[in-house]
């Protein structure tokens, strides 16, 4: 299956990644990625950019090397209330937001604690994607999270980085999450979670997992540029944007 979109990518701006935005975009262009989202970590992550960085993202051109560039963020969920480390004013300016749990920003809790954080985060209409939900450090009630994602029209990310060793033990959780999404008709988005340009667009591990559960193509958001743009527009994003 051909994937045209990668929305979970990082640059040197995040403090622990190794290539620039232009290097990421150039790599995307060379391998046929049509839409690249840049999603730096929110400011509570050590080494992450100042909040002004996110407020200034409109300076990034929409088209570079014939790749459409979306301006996003991987925001940190800070507590069981689902609060993010990005102010609402800035949230409203971004093209999309991935919301994730990171242990340097929120202590791993019980299944109930972790699930509550994700469920409450999804009450924020600015959140579009839940990031790396298969992380075994944060066990969750998968059925409850996937059901809430369907209710709130939030995409569930299946993270290739998690399956490539960055979060050991994620495979079984990710497979269960994928199966739950298939059963409930919840859309998923594949993310590379790239911290270097060479992994942009590489969904090899996720592809094998999705094949193993026979995931319907219509539930995968990375296959069609129009599908992801229409999804974000329906949520009030990309107001003055049109695919060329």
Curated annotation (Swiss-Prot):
<feature type="binding site">
    <location>
        <position position="41"/>
    </location>
    <ligand>
        <name>Zn(2+) 2</name>
    </ligand>
</feature>
<dbReference type="InterPro" id="IPR050243">
    <property type="entry name" value="PHP_phosphatase"/>
</dbReference>
<feature type="binding site">
    <location>
        <position position="10"/>
    </location>
    <ligand>
        <name>Zn(2+) 1</name>
    </ligand>
</feature>
<dbReference type="InterPro" id="IPR023710">
    <property type="entry name" value="Phosphatase_YcdX_put"/>
</dbReference>
<feature type="binding site">
    <location>
        <position position="74"/>
    </location>
    <ligand>
        <name>Zn(2+) 3</name>
    </ligand>
</feature>
<dbReference type="InterPro" id="IPR016195">
    <property type="entry name" value="Pol/histidinol_Pase-like"/>
</dbReference>
<keyword id="KW-0378">Hydrolase</keyword>
<keyword id="KW-0479">Metal-binding</keyword>
<dbReference type="InterPro" id="IPR004013">
    <property type="entry name" value="PHP_dom"/>
</dbReference>
<dbReference type="GO" id="GO:0016791">
    <property type="term" value="F:phosphatase activity"/>
</dbReference>
<dbReference type="Pfam" id="PF02811">
    <property type="entry name" value="PHP"/>
</dbReference>
<protein>
    <recommendedName>
        <fullName>Probable phosphatase CA_C0509</fullName>
        <ecNumber>3.1.3.-</ecNumber>
    </recommendedName>
</protein>
<feature type="binding site">
    <location>
        <position position="195"/>
    </location>
    <ligand>
        <name>Zn(2+) 2</name>
    </ligand>
</feature>
<comment type="similarity">
    <text>Belongs to the PHP family.</text>
</comment>
<feature type="binding site">
    <location>
        <position position="132"/>
    </location>
    <ligand>
        <name>Zn(2+) 3</name>
    </ligand>
</feature>
<dbReference type="InterPro" id="IPR003141">
    <property type="entry name" value="Pol/His_phosphatase_N"/>
</dbReference>
<feature type="binding site">
    <location>
        <position position="74"/>
    </location>
    <ligand>
        <name>Zn(2+) 1</name>
    </ligand>
</feature>
<dbReference type="GO" id="GO:0005829">
    <property type="term" value="C:cytosol"/>
</dbReference>
<feature type="binding site">
    <location>
        <position position="8"/>
    </location>
    <ligand>
        <name>Zn(2+) 1</name>
    </ligand>
</feature>
<keyword id="KW-0862">Zinc</keyword>
<feature type="binding site">
    <location>
        <position position="193"/>
    </location>
    <ligand>
        <name>Zn(2+) 1</name>
    </ligand>
</feature>
<dbReference type="GO" id="GO:0008270">
    <property type="term" value="F:zinc ion binding"/>
</dbReference>
<feature type="binding site">
    <location>
        <position position="16"/>
    </location>
    <ligand>
        <name>Zn(2+) 2</name>
    </ligand>
</feature>
<feature type="binding site">
    <location>
        <position position="102"/>
    </location>
    <ligand>
        <name>Zn(2+) 3</name>
    </ligand>
</feature>
């Amino acid at each position: 299956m051909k994937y045209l979109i990668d929305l979970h990518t990082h640059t040197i701006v995040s403090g622990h990644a190794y290539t620039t935005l232009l290097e990421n975009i150039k790599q995307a262009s060379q391998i046929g990625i049509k839409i690249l989202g840049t999603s730096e970590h929110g400011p509570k992550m050590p080494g992450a950019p100042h909040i002004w960085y996110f407020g200034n993202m409109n300076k990034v051109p929409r088209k570079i090397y014939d790749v459409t560039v979306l301006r996003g963020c991987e925001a940190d969920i800070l507590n069981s209330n689902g609060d993010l480390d990005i102010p609402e004013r800035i949230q409203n300016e971004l093209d999309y937001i991935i919301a994730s749990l990171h242990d340097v920003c929120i202590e791993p809790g019980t299944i109930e604690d972790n699930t509550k954080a994700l469920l409450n985060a999804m009450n924020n209409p600015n959140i579009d994607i839940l990031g790396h939900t298969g992380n075994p450090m944060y066990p969750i009630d998968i059925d409850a999270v996937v059901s809430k994602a369907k209710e709130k029209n939030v995409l569930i990310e299946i993270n290739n980085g998690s399956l490539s060793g960055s979060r050991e033990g994620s495979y079984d959780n990710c497979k269960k999450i994928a199966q739950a999404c298939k059963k409930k008709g919840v859309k998923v988005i594949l993310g590379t979670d790239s911290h270097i340009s060479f992994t942009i667009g590489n969904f090899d591990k996720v592809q094998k997992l999705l094949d193993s559960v026979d995931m319907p193509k219509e539930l995968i958001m990375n296959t069609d540029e129009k599908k992801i743009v229409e999804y974000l527009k329906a949520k009030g994003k990309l107001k003055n944007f049109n695919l060329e």
